[in-house]
Regions:
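Substrate-agnostic recognition of the 12-TM MFS/MFS-like secondary transporter fold
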Residues: 14-30, 54-68, 74-89, 106-163, ...
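Small-residue hotspots at the loop-to-helix junctions and early N-terminal turns
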Residues: 29, 42-52, 142, 265-272, ...
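Juxtamembrane intracellular "pre-TM" segments in multi-pass secondary transporters
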Residues: 1-12, 191-236
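Transmembrane alpha-helix termini and helix-breaking/packing motifs in multi-pass membrane transporters
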Residues: 34-40, 93-99, 154-174, 254, ...
Length: 422
């Protein structure tokens, strides 16, 4: 196993603890939003898809802004502020529940604010990991993703217990996760702007050129991503995948649980926990093999295996096989997400890393609500199970493009200097 220096171990501990608390709080929100819409407010598939779109899309602007800020300011300070501000939306929603004022619009507004804060802070969170990883980026990414999966499982299971614990109490726990996470962030070293980014010179002439505007900085990041074909391919393929696959998980699975299997919030939570358990196994299993020489090949091969998972669920299997399918879907997601993130963070130039990560995360986050809207319409017209068919076709197309039209299959990790054993 790779061993990190002691001071790096401590920094990783602070980072992963705060990251785990953030993921626990955010996973509580994700399941609560879905089940409140489907199981409590009894909304139609089209309304659920539209609500997910309204919650997710406005956060896209903040994602690009977060990438700019992540390259310019102390990322630790930005994360602390995001944690503290994230305490507020669950408290507002808890008050609405207590006053018997829970409705679609108050749910959308509070979830939207939480999503905006997540979008603004995510690029800085990813960039800080590069700093604390101490040259073991693949290992650190896999470890943090695995720990995040554990936290997500715990948060999801807590959210699924609203009938036993109470909705207000669960929302208070969500706020506590964000608040305690801010405390652990204090242990991180301050992280200033990118080392390759221009810094002000006190001895420079007063006629020196001003700092680029936020707009021009965002534009530079988008242009950098577009002209970098491998980065463009990874961002585009992940968007395409998330549109149909993450969208299906967000909208189709809750309706499949509710209508096909006559389940409740606890069953949805347990299925989600099994999903993230599969992701957990994937990420901690990857630690044994890190660093990988050819992450792109792993990424593409797993696209084909996802087709089998979606087909199994579409076939309307017994509950036992549904558990198995959910676990392998999570395993698949854990590997593909980690591999794509590894490649993006390895190929990014330091001065553009936060902005490239913001574009990458933007693709993932924008695809899910858009896919939710489209697949909500598909469910309304063709049924819950048929919303899985587009994901099967998309996975086949991703493999074909990545193998034939992109350098993803040939990509080799720069962290390995030894010849490829293959």
């Amino acid at each position: 196993m790779l061993k990190l220096p002691a001071n790096t171990d401590l920094q990783m501990t602070w980072y992963n603890t705060s990251h785990a608390l953030w993921m626990a709080g955010f996973s509580i929100q994700q399941l609560l939003v879905t089940w409140i819409l489907v199981g409590i407010l009894d909304q139609s598939p089209e309304t659920v898809g539209l609500a997910q779109l309204l919650i997710g899309v406005p956060a896209l602007i903040f994602m690009l802004w977060g990438g700019v800020i992540g390259d310019r300011v102390d990322g630790r300070g930005l994360l602390i502020q995001s944690h503290l501000l994230s305490i507020i939306p669950p408290l507002v929603l808890a008050l609405a529940v207590y006053l018997d004022q829970l409705g679609v619009w108050i749910l959308i507004l509070t979830a939207l604010v939480a999503n905006l804060l997540n979008s603004a802070s995510n690029p800085a969170r990813n960039t800080i990991l590069n700093l604390v990883a101490a040259g073991r980026l693949q290992w650190a990414i896999s470890l943090s993703t695995g720990i995040g999966a554990i936290a997500t499982m715990i948060g999801t299971r807590v959210a699924g217990s609203i009938d036993q614990i109470g909705l207000v109490q669960v929302l208070l726990l969500q706020s506590a996760c964000f608040g305690v996470g801010a405390i652990f962030l204090i242990g991180l070293r301050a992280s200033g702007p990118s080392t390759d980014a221009p810094s002000p010179n006190p001895n420079a002439s007063s006629t020196a050129l001003p700092q680029p505007s936020t707009y021009s900085t965002i534009r530079a990041g988008l242009v950098y991503t577009w002209r970098f074909k491998l980065a463009r391919d990874l961002v585009g393929l992940n968007f395409f995948s998330s549109f149909f696959n993450a969208g299906a998980w967000m909208v189709a699975i809750p309706f499949i649980i509710s209508r096909v299997y006559a389940g409740d919030a606890l069953l949805l939570a347990n299925i989600t926990v099994v999903f993230y358990f599969g992701s957990l196994i994937a990420n901690f299993g990857l630690l044994k093999f890190m660093p990988l020489s050819r992450p792109g090949q792993v990424y593409l091969i797993l696209q084909l295996s996802r087709v089998l998972v979606l087909y199994l669920i579409w076939y309307e299997p017994s509950m036992t096989w549904l558990w198995i399918a959910a676990a392998f879907w999570g395993f698949n997601m854990g590997v593909t997400n980690t591999m794509s993130r590894v490649m993006i963070q390895e190929i990014a130039e330091p001065a553009f890393r936060a902005r490239l990560m913001s574009v990458f995360t933007l693709g993932l986050m924008s695809a899910t609500p858009m896919g939710s809207l489209v697949l909500g319409i598909v469910i309304g017209q063709f049924g819950e199970l048929n919303a899985l068919i587009p994901g099967m076709l998309a996975s086949i197309m991703i493999f074909y493009y990545g193998y034939k039209r992109s350098d993803i299959w040939q990509y080799r990790s720069p962290v390995l200097a030894a010849p490829d054993p293959a």
